Amino acid sequence: MNSINVKIKRIRPEKGNPLPRYMTAHAAGVDLCADLDQELVLEPGERTLVPTGIAIELPEGYEAQIRPRSGLALKHGISLVNSPGTIDADYRGEIGVIVINHGNEPFVISNNERIAQMVFAPFTRAVFQDVAELGETARGEGGFGHTGR
């Protein structure tokens, strides 16, 4: 299993909120917790930015992906609007999670509640070549369900 060193800063250290952590030995992502002064009620169809109380410094060549938690999605219809969200290596601000309630009931988010997961990944940057034509393939321009439903 590979690992990288990630510097982490607590935005409000006096609150003593937990740092992200892996919940199982083989988990790909760490859980991110809400950093709230009071409970937040998310009505059906409503979205909001939830602070996490942390900022990170990633090594060059890496990104962090913010993803929904499957249990919240299945049980409550809670997801992320921009999924996955991307944290770039040069971003130093507080990580915020844009949460949306796709469920039928209001959803209460409490301080320290696990609201999303963060996965670290290397990335490759493209060097674009401006061309007049692209190579032919059997698929061609077919897309958006052209192979079936």
Curated annotation (Swiss-Prot):
Its cofactor is Mg(2+). Keywords: Hydrolase, Magnesium, Metal-binding, Nucleotide metabolism. GO terms for biological process: dUMP biosynthetic process; dUTP catabolic process. Pfam families: dUTPase (PF00692). Its EC number is 3.6.1.23. Substrate binds at residues 69-71, 82, 86-88. The keyword Hydrolase applies. It catalyses: dUTP + H2O = dUMP + diphosphate + H(+). It comes from the Bacteria. Pathway: Pyrimidine metabolism; dUMP biosynthesis; dUMP from dCTP (dUTP route): step 2/2. HAMAP family: dUTPase_bact. Belongs to the dUTPase family. This enzyme is involved in nucleotide metabolism: it produces dUMP, the immediate precursor of thymidine nucleotides and it decreases the intracellular concentration of dUTP so that uracil cannot be incorporated into DNA. PANTHER family: DEOXYURIDINE 5'-TRIPHOSPHATE NUCLEOTIDOHYDROLASE. NCBIfam families: dut, PRK00601.1. This is Deoxyuridine 5'-triphosphate nucleotidohydrolase. It comes from Geotalea daltonii (strain DSM 22248 / JCM 15807 / FRC-32).
